[in-house]
Amino acid sequence: MFANSARNALKKRPQNLQPFRFQGCLFSKRANRPLTTKVQHLIYASVDDKALVTLFDQPRSTLRSPFATTGLFGHPSLTHPRALISLADATVVRAQLLTDRILRARESRTELLRVVKNLDRLSDMLCGVIDLAELVRNAHPDRSWVDAANRAYETLCEFMNVLNTHVGLYEVLKAVLSDPSIVKTLGPEAHQTALIFWRDFEKSAIDLPAEQRKKFVSLSSDILVLGRQFLEGANAPRPPASIKPSQLSGLKDKGMGVRLQLQAQFTQRDLQVYPGSLQAQMIMRSAPEEEPRRQVYLAANSSTPQQIEVLEKLLRTRAELARLVGRDSFAHMTLDDKMAKTPDNVWNFLDALMDHTKPFARRALHTLSERKQLHHGTSSLPIIQAWDRDFYCPPDPPAPPIPLPPLTLGTVFMGLSRLFQHMYGISLRPADSASGEVWHTDVQKLEVVDQDQGIIGWIYADLFARRGKASGAAHYTVRCSRRTDDDDESSDGTVEGAELLIYESQEFEAVKRHRLPNQDGIYQLPLVVLLCEFARPTPSKGPTVLEWHEVLTLFHEMGHAMHSMIGRTEYQNVAGTRCATDFVEFPSILMEHFLNSPTVLSLFDVDGTSTVRHIGNHHNDPCHFIDTYSQILLAAVDQVYHSPAVLDPTFDSTAELAKVHNTRGLIPYVPGTSFQTQFGHLYGYGATYYSYLLDRAIASRVWRNVFLDDPLDRETGEKFKCEVLRFGGGKDPWKMVSALLDVPELSTGDAEAMREIGRWKINSEIGVHGRH
């Protein structure tokens, strides 16, 4: 509950999104399909839309007002690193006052009625600084700011850890939820917020005797330490494969192949090829002989006994923690508040998805087997081994469905703004930033503008690669939405001698508050940061031209951003992307599907006057189904690893991995391999790795059934906005999906609902792994 920032950073994961809650070489068919759409109803690019092109494509510094001076994100106090540490201290003082107020709530019915509101305020008070510090830790180029952010983060997390197991807070919330007369006064958002706090308290062993709570804290600390060790091992280099030069004859890649041969002749030794290197990738895709590919595969999937021991100890400790709080397994404990609800329901989904995907994957493997037979000249179809996949079906980079001119970063942002105007009546507008407001000259500030309500939030775009910046793509929620005019903060009290600190914290929060037209109350508006690592535009090379996978990434991250902007709830604990782990990726994956529409792609045309009339170069890649099936198997392994089985003294993670592959897989397990020690999601997504598959299935169905025929239809966009995005995490995701698809049977979210989603086709045209 009070154990980390919100869904702070929705990050690109190599295979590690850490969710926070306040706590082709096949016989591939290129279908020449006519994609003819007369574009007559497009909204032309506005002055603001065209300004986005200039903003991102011109190699100049951030737009700044020459007169204004402020601190980070417009907070006047945050002009130097020490101020961040001071703000953390001030926040602790105010948070303690609010905690004391909540603890006294049973003295007054009026205060009991305010408990849920005050718990949410307490959460926001702490997360508002923690989330900002988390961004600074990952993006600020100045080491002194990073150090200050680390100190602030640690100070507030330490305080949060106290709140997590605070029996008094739990007892007050219990009194509220046990009183029907109070519960019936709670609106849907308030009730959902209360339940989130309640569940998180329960997961923290709050109702156990003191000795068991102490044990819970100890096990939780052990899990953090083991998790760090596991991730270090997962990212550690694997030992090289020793390849004989004679085994590399006939390499398809002549350039690197010749270099390797010359290297071997010069050294008079076998080649040492490190997994993950360009040489290793070249061998896996280009070596006609099987043996070097096999050797590289074995090396790439090797583990030390210590790495396996760390993982198994992590899994056992999680299971012990779950047993301590009365749950059968870590999966049972984790899935309570997810769409899936139970491990059985996850298996219902995975089994159905396997059954649906297996025929397509078998067909693809049969084609690979035919190619292998032709290659080796055998009389019978050979078995496809794990090291054959990339040789007989080398991965193709993602490509647009129709030929497109080079897409610059500014052009893509213009297209996004025009898309949001069609769908939601919302646009993006460049904004000046004051001196001191941003952490690097690369950072550009965008206003998110609703046609009826004006500015509804801000996006700070930090999109170019630089030294010291976090790698990958990420969406950081620095500030969540929350209603503030009914805070009644004057009743929080004060502390003699701490008036200046209290004022400092209050001023920090006051900057966030705004009154919107046509909406009751005053709200703090959402503020998000997009981090990417695109190439920087230069005067000599011109603007940044994005690869197609980078366009997909940007659409994905902007899906998260619009969820944050539109999900402006009264309670920050359910705002925007603060929703169930197995639902949060749905809006962002859906955004990728829009790139399959020629009509949407026409929005990249600045004049908006062209007729979309192209022959599509749509590429049906059969190997997609092999990859999807492999991901399903990993989700199955994740469930096994977080089941009661891990407490069996004979539990062996490698044996269980082999069992899943040999009983449910299509490609045989390779003895001597232990990929599980590199499966980083086992820590960040323990027991919930199925989530991305679930959201891909939902997004594919919503695209086909809701948006495909007319993706720019405003009525359809409004339906998605009103049935899904605006609720954030304040409504049952099953009810949202049910209403959006007009399928009432899904609303129960039961075992059959999970099976039904498992039977839906996952679109093969999008969903590049690793984008979150």
From Swiss-Prot:
PROSITE patterns, per database record: ZINC_PROTEASE (PS00142)
Active site positions, chain numbering: 557
Main location: mitochondrion
Cofactor list: Zn(2+)
Keywords: Hydrolase, Metal-binding, Metalloprotease, Mitochondrion, Protease, Transit peptide, Zinc
Transit pept. (range): 1-42
GO cellular component: mitochondrial matrix
One Gene Ontology MF term: metalloendopeptidase activity
Note on how the cofactor is bound: Binds 1 zinc ion.
Recorded catalytic activity of this chain's protein: Release of an N-terminal octapeptide as second stage of processing of some proteins imported into the mitochondrion
SUPFAM superfamilies: Metalloproteases ('zincins'), catalytic domain
UniProt-listed GO biological process terms: peptide metabolic process; protein processing involved in protein targeting to mitochondrion
Entries under Gene3D superfamilies matching the protein: Collagenase (Catalytic Domain), Neurolysin, domain 3
Family: Belongs to the peptidase M3 family.
General function of this protein: Cleaves proteins, imported into the mitochondrion, to their mature size. While most mitochondrial precursor proteins are processed to the mature form in one step by mitochondrial processing peptidase (MPP), the sequential cleavage by MIP of an octapeptide after initial processing by MPP is a required step for a subgroup of nuclear-encoded precursor proteins destined for the matrix or the inner membrane.
Protein name: Mitochondrial intermediate peptidase
